[in-house]
Amino acid sequence: MSFENKLPTPLENNDAKGHMVCTLNKTTDARRAAETLSIAFSNSPAFHFICKKILNIPLAEKVPTRTITTDIISPFLDSPYGEISEVNTFDAVAVWSLPPHVPKARSNDAKFNKDFIDDLNARVKQVIPNGINYYYLFCIGKNLNEKGIRGSVRTIFEEYKRRADEENCAIVLEAIAEHAKSVYEYFGFRNYMTFKYGECEVDSNGNCDPNGEGFTAYLMIYHKDGNKVLKE
């Protein structure tokens, strides 16, 4: 899933001195990766909601962002099909599931599983033809404390799009904010499903509310020949 984390706009692709930023590495350093992601998502109620559901933590329980971030990305380091990438000494971090994929963690909450896993999996199968695999971007975040470094998120997308293109793969992600959706559209992703989750559990700020509207998110998919091969 890709959460609301104030991603830079598409034009923010240079550092403060006008120098293109483009150093990407794979990493197994869970501590550093979790640190960046916890900064990126510290003020994201959707991040906390989703992670608490997956980790089966009561919604009303206060848990440090660093703690749930570390726990939520650990399966990707433990699996041969998981991959964590970082750019510019952890200025940005992305967590990936590669074919044949890290099994999606399921919550004890059947409704959440339906809304956020089962319905989306079914839609992905409708959109992506048989014979085409896909990369799944679980989450991506920028260190918002490093305002002078730009282009890190762009570098991640450009590299993984290049890899996916070479392998004739699609890329799948969930965007939970309009701003993030706009950024992903710039990078060639299209929205194939708008969906709700957390209804009658929380309000849009993540506060427990039995009448709450929950959150709105978007299932977005990229393929180099998307207009030709992806199904509406």
From Swiss-Prot:
Its main location: cytoplasm. GO terms for cellular component: cytoplasm; nucleus. InterPro entries: N-acetyltrans/Recomb-assoc (IPR052564). Keywords: Cytoplasm, Nucleus. It is found in: Cytoplasm; Nucleus. The keyword Nucleus applies. Transmembrane segments: none annotated. Present with 6020 molecules/cell in log phase SD medium. PANTHER family: ACETYLTRANSFERASE (PTHR43451:SF1), ACETYLTRANSFERASE (GNAT) FAMILY PROTEIN (PTHR43451). This is Uncharacterized protein YDR391C. It comes from Saccharomyces cerevisiae (strain ATCC 204508 / S288c) (Baker's yeast). The lineage of its organism: Eukaryota, Fungi, Dikarya, Ascomycota, Saccharomycotina.
